[in-house]
């Protein structure tokens, strides 16, 4: 079978020019053709000028590739009007109106005041918005990281609760214990701090002074300090003085009272205040308890640091974002506590009349004070409370060494005792508080409320120390850094008087609950055999554990600290 024959069609070839022939054949008649017109707007093969047609969507792309359309034309074909109308100018030939120059001056003065007011408002808005911008940027970064975490699966494997048992896997911050627990220590009891809020021991009368056991001399308060304000601040001076840090068992007065049967439970005001405010504390602390016969001594460990964890003046402990315990820089919890200690020691000495005659108690010096080193500027009163019958049916008689910082002339020239403490501002942008230098004069209550919220445990301890000592008034100071990046220089911005009983109700400090907590701890220790025990607040959970300690625990630390003190004296 023969295959079909393939024949090529004949094509018209223009040998004398470019383009089709002038006379088309019959084969080309069905093909439409339009003659070339010079008025047509012809685009280019690659038009890089007409960029306005790129990224068009939907019906906007209609007719953009039609021959002669405006979308294919370059800007070189656009019509430009040659006449420049900017050269024309209208001339006002009317006669100007005469104006009152005094009125113009008043108008200009009013405009100037408005401009200055707007400028001041703008500056305040900029200062206030700086922190807001920082918080917004941090929130955006956290939101971005959270979205990235969700894209990668999130906590799908762990359900709604992640590691640590908290919603979204929010693990608690790592806090170090105040003392390292050793394997030979035995846990005898765990006390849940959340249950402490339900305890109450009502009808506890005020403490009584024990005989003539009142020691020291105090200076009168300098009332010129009350004129201090943010605008009239004064620098915090570095006042020389002695600070005595005597434990309960080393106090010769307490030893004498214990031998004389003055009580069966002994402690200092700061130790008892720490126990009574335990539900408010966040950081770890520890208290040593000695059971000797039918008596109980609450004591503190001898550490190489200036202060024991019980006496540490924590800063922003109960805030939403507390400082890291041992981080880099000057704003870690340990260095801030040391700074607060020096501020309080200098503040309580600066606000009294150190060169004038003071008020002397029945004994000018305490037995543990050294005559050669000088006075400490602190008075000590030994007081006693009856806390009812204990677990063995015998009455619980509490003996406490309390401290006072100054005296002041009250109504009728009556001498009243003072407890002097100071708040310290370190960096308002990091502490979550308010700027004292802008808010303290006009919003003192808001600043105090913020400090009470961020330092709930410390403020409660101060109030309890004043109540245990029978202090008539508390004097609170506000001390701020001159430079947020330096801890060398500080200024006193303001001072404030508060009554201890009224202040306790303002900070929701219930004395019946505090006595109930202390009595619960005393009963737990009294149930144990004579020996040495340790009460330690857990750093991660609201729990106090009672440990039984072997004989000789912490004795090496005591000996090493004594050797260091003897070397310093030499």
Swiss-Prot record:
Extract one GO cellular component term from the record.
Answer: eukaryotic translation initiation factor 3 complex
- Bias category Acidic residues: which stretches? 560-570
According to its UniProt entry, one GO biological process term is:
formation of cytoplasmic translation initiation complex
In what ranges is there compositional bias, type Low complexity?
151-160
Picking any one GO molecular function of the record gives: mRNA cap binding
Q: Where is this region: RNA gate?
A: 309-323
* Key words, A-Z: Cytoplasm, Initiation factor, Protein biosynthesis, RNA-binding
* Annotated localization: Cytoplasm
Q: Which InterPro entries match?
A: eIF3d
Region annotated Disordered, chain positions: 150-175, 551-570
What does the record note on quaternary structure?
Answer: Component of the eukaryotic translation initiation factor 3 (eIF-3) complex.
- Function summary: mRNA cap-binding component of the eukaryotic translation initiation factor 3 (eIF-3) complex, which is involved in protein synthesis of a specialized repertoire of mRNAs and, together with other initiation factors, stimulates binding of mRNA and methionyl-tRNAi to the 40S ribosome. The eIF-3 complex specifically targets and initiates translation of a subset of mRNAs involved in cell proliferation. In the eIF-3 complex, eif3d specifically recognizes and binds the 7-methylguanosine cap of a subset of mRNAs.
Q: Quote the entry's note on domains.
A: The RNA gate region regulates mRNA cap recognition to prevent promiscuous mRNA-binding before assembly of eif3d into the full eukaryotic translation initiation factor 3 (eIF-3) complex.
UniProt family annotation: Belongs to the eIF-3 subunit D family.
Q: Give the protein name, as stated in the record.
A: Eukaryotic translation initiation factor 3 subunit D
Q: Which gene encodes it?
A: eif-3.D
């Amino acid at each position: 079978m023969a295959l079909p024959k393939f024949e090529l069609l004949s094509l018209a070839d223009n040998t004398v020019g470019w383009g089709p022939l002038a006379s088309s054949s019959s084969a080309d008649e069905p093909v439409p053709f339009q003659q070339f017109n010079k008025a047509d707007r012809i685009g280019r093969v690659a038009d890089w000028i007409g960029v306005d047609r790129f990224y068009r969507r939907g019906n906007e792309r209609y007719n953009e590739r039609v021959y002669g359309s405006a979308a294919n034309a370059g800007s070189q074909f656009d019509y430009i009007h040659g006449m420049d109308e900017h050269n024309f100018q209208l001339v006002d030939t009317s006669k100007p109106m005469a104006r009152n120059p005094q009125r113009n001056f008043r108008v200009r003065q009013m405009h100037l005041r408005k401009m200055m007011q707007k400028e001041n408002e703008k500056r305040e808005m900029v200062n206030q918005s700086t922190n807001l911008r920082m918080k917004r940027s941090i929130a955006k970064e956290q939101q971005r990281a959270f979205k990235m975490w969700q894209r990668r699966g999130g906590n799908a494997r762990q359900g709604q609760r992640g590691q640590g048992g908290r919603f979204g896997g929010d693990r608690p911050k790592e806090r170090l214990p105040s003392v390292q627990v050793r394997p030979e220590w035995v846990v005898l009891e765990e006390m849940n701090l959340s249950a402490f809020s339900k305890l109450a021991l009502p009808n506890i009368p005020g403490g009584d002074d024990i005989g003539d056991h009142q020691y020291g001399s105090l200076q009168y308060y300098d009332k010129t300090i009350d004129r201090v304000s943010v605008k009239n601040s004064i620098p915090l001076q570095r006042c020389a003085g002695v600070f005595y840090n005597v434990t309960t068992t080393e106090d010769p007065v307490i030893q004498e009272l214990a031998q004389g049967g003055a009580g069966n439970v002994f402690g200092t005001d700061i130790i008892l205040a720490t126990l009574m405010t335990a539900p408010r504390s966040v950081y770890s602390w520890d208290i040593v308890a000695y059971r000797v016969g039918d008596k109980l001594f609450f004591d503190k460990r001898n550490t190489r640091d200036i202060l024991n964890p019980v006496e540490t003046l924590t800063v922003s402990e109960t805030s939403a974002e507390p400082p890291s315990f041992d981080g880099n820089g000057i704003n870690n919890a340990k260095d801030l506590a040391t700074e607060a200690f020096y501020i309080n020691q200098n503040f309580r000495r600066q606000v009294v009349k150190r060169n004038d005659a003071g008020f002397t108690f029945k004994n000018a010096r305490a037995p543990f004070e050294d005559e050669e080193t000088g006075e400490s500027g602190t008075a000590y009163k030994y007081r006693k409370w009856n806390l009812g019958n204990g677990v063995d049916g015998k009455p619980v008689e509490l003996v406490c060494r309390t401290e006072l910082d100054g005296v002041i002339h009250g109504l009728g020239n009556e001498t009243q005792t003072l407890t002097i403490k100071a708040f310290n501002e370190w960096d308002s942008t990091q502490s979550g508080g308010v700027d004292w230098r802008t808010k303290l004069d006009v919003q003192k209550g808001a600043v105090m409320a913020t400090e009470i919220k961020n330092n709930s445990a410390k403020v409660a301890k101060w109030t309890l120390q004043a109540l245990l000592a029978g202090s008539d008034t508390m004097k609170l100071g506000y001390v701020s850094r001159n430079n947020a990046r330096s801890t060398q220089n500080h200024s006193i911005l303001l001072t404030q008087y508060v009554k201890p009983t009224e202040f306790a109700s303002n900070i929701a400090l219930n004395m019946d609950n505090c006595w109930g907590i202390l009595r619960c701890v005393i009963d737990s220790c009294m149930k144990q055999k004579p020996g040495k025990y340790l009460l330690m607040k857990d750093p991660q959970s609201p729990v106090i554990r009672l440990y039984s300690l072997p004989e000789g625990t912490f004795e090496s630390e005591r000996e090493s600290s004594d050797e260091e003190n003897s070397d310093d004296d030499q």
